[in-house]
Amino acid sequence: MRVRVAVLKVVIVILLLVLCVEFVFYLFVVPATSFAKVEFSGNVTISPEYLMKAAGLTGKEKWMSLDGFTISERLASVPLLAQVEVLKKFPDTMHVHVVERVAIALGFVHVQGRAMPVQIDKTGTVFSVGTAPLDTVLPVVSGLEFRNPRVGLRVHDQLVPLFVQLDNLSKRNPLLLGEISEISIEQKRHGGYDLALYLVRAPIRVRMDKNLSEEKLRYVILLVDALREWQTQRRIKELDVRGGTAVYR
């Protein structure tokens, strides 16, 4: 009986030692010696290789040596990214979730005498110069001024609500947004701005205030459709809805 108890104690001690060794191995050895596994999510158009390079990673870093805050800061400085979240998972994984910027409108700037498109997101941030999305038709916003156009620039603070409204339209009623060909920003003499809309369906310039809501746009399109019937009898060039009543010229 005593022999069995002694053997059982030895077995228990051995098991405890094995567990301690495994605990130490996973707690200290694996994080300090294993190459970190970097996982990305949320990237649709950006490759993992691009993100690795932007984060300053080579794929040979040890998990223990990774600084999540530094990596997050590096990726947050990439103009193509709107949000970045870095999470280190014990013992050897780092997960990086990104949210890419999405173009809500196009602008045009002049670089060395050439007109080039710039992509602008809902925050009014320019994140691409010289390229336009091939699979999406976006409204053009004219009247923007950039002295030195480059990625990372933002439009003036007073214009940001316009891009927020465009983003809301794209989510709630993209077909309605697709009716807009161009939005021209017209600065007022004493501050603020009005808008001039050019619609796809008719060559009529629509002047309105900066409230580009879904209801207002529906109202404008309804008026334009009514005026189209008069186009054969009258040459209407402009519709003004800024004063609460519609005036055509």
Locate predicted features.
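Charged, solvent-exposed interaction patches on well-folded alpha/beta domains
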Residues: 1-28, 33-35, 53-60, 73, ...
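Glycine-centered tight turns that cap/initiate beta-strands
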Residues: 80-83
